[in-house]
């Protein structure tokens, strides 16, 4: 095997941490000596040992003189865990092969520099594109301080998210719905508008057996969420944030007593200032948001530039209906040339349904 093949193994290991490491990155490490893998590991959960230390601990032979393959530049600072470069140097590893550079200002090339200054051979940028893609959430969060937002919706082939009656269970099949539950596990937060709460009274949890529930964020400009709504009555068990413009302390106290966190924010174009909300969520170490809003919230999120990705689950059905809801509503763009552009699209078949996942491309002046 060569550097690329060993790095692919490290990438596969890193993937095992998805949903558990936030706001840290997913990282995998493989240690090779005399053509054989003698140790491998990954960052399993936030606050626990990093991939490099796990790989060293799993070694079946002395790692002195070996090569370590790691998907992200090793850290060189003290956080919840000690610096990984210290463990690498102490082990006698002779060569380190790295996928992605770490843009964290506490690392940002310092890990590589430290290794080289101690005589360790370092090879960089092996499968960098794949390693960067693995941690697109982390890379966005660490460079902007704001969550990576993925707008998710399910629609028919004629672009409807519900029938004209409002009925929406179910647009897609079971396989696609299971995939959505995986996304809820993988994203740190889930966000809807008060309209969704009023219409559906959703629980907004992860229904995977061993999955992690996302932090629930409700955009509710005027605090219209019913105190008996499921997101309120379960807030003592599942972290729930109400983002509002209502500064009335008595009304806020109703939700706070139930266990909700209430964020009072500025109003922008008749709704909660979503950019300000992203800043606040970033400070709460919420690195990613699965936006499951209706057409109004989705348009507002696009219009203010907070969405990085769109996940469209498309069912081979036709609903019709002049008044049937669509995924993105609001004012809309005045002309085709003004459309929000999507790039780097990926297509996946999920049973009879399709998932199209694309990045949102904003003009430089608008990008979040």
Q: Which ranges hold each PLM region?
A:
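Short beta-strand scaffold segments in enzyme catalytic cores
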Residues: 27-35, 153-154, 356
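Conserved histidine-centered catalytic loops in small-molecule metabolism enzymes
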Residues: 247, 330-368
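Short gly/pro/ser/thr-enriched loop/turn and capping motifs at secondary-structure boundaries
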Residues: 103-106, 129, 198, 224-226, ...
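Zn2+-dependent cytidine deaminase-like catalytic core
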Residues: 31-130, 215, 241, 246, ...
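Residue-level signal for inorganic ion chemistry
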Residues: 10, 28, 75, 115, ...
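Flexible, gly/pro- and Lys/Arg-enriched active-site loops
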Residues: 303-342
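Short, basic/aromatic recognition patches
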Residues: 2-22, 141
């Amino acid at each position: 095997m060569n550097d690329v093949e060993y790095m692919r193994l490290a990438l596969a290991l890193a993937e095992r941490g998805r949903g558990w490491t936030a706001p840290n990155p997913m990282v995998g490490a493989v240690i090779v000596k005399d053509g054989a893998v003698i140790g491998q590991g990954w960052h399993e959960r936030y606050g626990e040992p990093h991939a490099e230390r796990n790989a060293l601990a799993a070694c079946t032979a002395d790692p002195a003189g070996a090569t370590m393959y790691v998907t992200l530049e090793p850290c060189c600072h003290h956080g919840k865990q000690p610096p990984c470069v210290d463990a690498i140097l102490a082990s006698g590893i002779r060569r380190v092969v790295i996928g992605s550079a770490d843009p964290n200002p506490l690392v940002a090339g310092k890990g590589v520099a430290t290794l080289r200054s101690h005589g360790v051979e370092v090879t960089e940028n092996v499968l960098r594109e794949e390693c960067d893609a693995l941690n697109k959430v982390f890379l966005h969060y660490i460079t902007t301080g704001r969550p990576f937002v993925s707008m998710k919706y399910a629609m028919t082939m004629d672009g409807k998210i519900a029938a004209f009656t409002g009925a929406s269970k179910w647009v897609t099949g079971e396989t696609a719905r299971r995939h959505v539950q995986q996304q809820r596990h993988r994203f740190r937060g889930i966000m809807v508008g008060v309209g969704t709460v009023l219409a559906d009274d959703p629980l907004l949890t992860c229904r995977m057996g061993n999955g992690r529930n996302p932090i629930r964020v409700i955009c509710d400009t005027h605090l219209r969420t019913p105190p008996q709504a499921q997101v309120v009555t379960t807030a003592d068990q599942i972290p729930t944030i109400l983002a509002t413009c209502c500064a009335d302390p008595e009304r806020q106290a109703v939700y706070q007593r139930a266990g909700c966190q209430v964020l009072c924010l500025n109003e922008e174009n008749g709704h909660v200032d979503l950019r300000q909300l992203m800043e606040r969520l970033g400070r709460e170490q919420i690195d990613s948001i699965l936006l499951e809003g209706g057409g109004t919230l989705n348009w507002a999120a696009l219009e203010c530039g907070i969405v990085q990705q769109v996940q469209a689950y498309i069912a081979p059905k036709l609903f019709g209906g002049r008044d049937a809801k669509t995924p993105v509503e609001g004012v809309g763009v005045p002309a085709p040339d003004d459309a929000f552009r999507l790039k780097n699209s990926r297509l996946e078949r999920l049973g009879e349904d399709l998932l199209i996942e694309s990045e949102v491309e904003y003009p430089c002046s608008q990008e979040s």
